[in-house]
From Swiss-Prot:
It comes from Chlorobium chlorochromatii (strain CaD3). The gene is lspA. GO terms for molecular function: aspartic-type endopeptidase activity. Its main location: membrane. The lineage of its organism: Bacteria, Pseudomonadati, Chlorobiota, Chlorobiia, Chlorobiales. This is Lipoprotein signal peptidase. This protein specifically catalyzes the removal of signal peptides from prolipoproteins. The active site is at D113, D139.
Amino acid sequence: MKLFFSLALFVVAADQFSKYVALRFLRDANQSISIIPNFFSFTYAENRGIAFGLEPAPPALLLLFTMMISAAVLWYVLRSNNRRLIFLLPFSLILGGGVGNMIDRMVRGYVVDFIYFNLYNGYVGNIYLSLWPIFNIADSAITIGGTMLLLFHRTLFPDDPIA
């Protein structure tokens, strides 16, 4: 369990530190710093919604939802007897990412996003399309953890008939 909590704490710390740097160097001076021209940049954004910029509910409800998901992940891991790394790793990434974004919602009322891959910006017919959202380390951890759960479902949950 030390590994589970250590990794979750590391994700929270890395996420919060990176957001501090984004707030300090991107918010007021330059909204964007190009790393690889026309492909990768650090671009400051305030996300009041959830993944991919969706705003399905008021901020207080999103905060409550984040708290409930984080509590459910923690409860599930503590209740389980499985202590293998392949089991703990995805859940620690999801918990750490959830807590990192939850801190932002509690302190600022929005989540700081700053990582941007410019995969495609342009028109498809008459519709303008921006193919990739701006995200942060917490979002990355949640996505990686969720992907691991999907990829290793049979290994993680061998008794599940869906596996």
